[in-house]
Amino acid sequence: MHTRRTTLISAALLALVTVALPVRAQTTLLNVSYDVSRELYKDINPAFAAHWKTQSGDTLTLNQSHGGSSKQAGAVIGGLEADVVTMNQSPDIDILVKNGLVSADWRKRLPNDATPYTTTTVFLVRKGNPKAIKDWSDLTRAGLQVIVPNPKTSGNGRYTYLAAWGYALNKANDEAAAKDFVSKLFANVPVLDGGGRGATTTFTQRGIGDVLVTFENEAVLLDKELGGDQFDIVYPSLSIEAAAPVAVVDKVVDKRATRRQAEAYLQYLYSAEGQDIIARHHFRPRSEAALKKYAKQFPPVSTFTVEAKLGGWDAVQKTHFADGGIYDQIVTRR
């Protein structure tokens, strides 16, 4: 009897101890990003999940959503609960600020105005470059087909438009001449896809176009995936620096109690491991060590920024991409 009673007491104590053990949290994060970053974050996410597990002991599940950058921003405004956004142009985060989703000081929260990496705009042409495309001026030739995503919905397309505009300004130092130049270029665009990956599909799978204008990382990815025997990459004489801004979606993380994880996720992008993954995916990292390590894969290219050459994103948005702006005028003339 005494033995049975002792056994029951021991079992009860064991149950109490079991109940008292801490339960590790299982949390999900959603990263809403632009079209051609999906391969990057497919590698970043498991690496960060392992890092977080080591640091906190908690299991973290990371999900990702991709599309044209501006369309993705619209989805977040429409109710898609992103814990973080990783875009390719700052207007797509600023519009979240205007809608009360992101704090106005988002640029100050992380280094380099919250841009952990950059890329630039290049040309992808058919193998052997049969149309002898070397620079932006070649894209205005009659009969040439240029594939580019829609600048209204895609940051990739917007950078293409602005890179061409900047090139024309350098040549003529005249706004009217720049408008005429970009009008001729877009007259050669047979279809405007909603995002960068859609434009890639049009060029590589549907066989439409003589040249795809896209981000450097996308061009290199395609060249590698297809064995290097279908396309060549051409670097124009002048291009644009495309900095990739990131931000915590404050309204969502406060609602979901995921701020700590979301902030750590974005900080991880600046870590040595994060910068190495970024460089391996042919984005240009901010880390000097990573840039040096992968120097051979990043040819020197002359670039300008929206801020230095075009007056900043606010001016660009109002002048070029607002309803009735220069881009709309150009498209209407097509």
What are the language-model segments listed below?
Residues 20-22:
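N-terminal signal peptide c-region/cleavage motif recognized by signal peptidases
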Residues 253-334:
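Extracellular/periplasmic juxtamembrane helices and adjacent flexible linkers that interface
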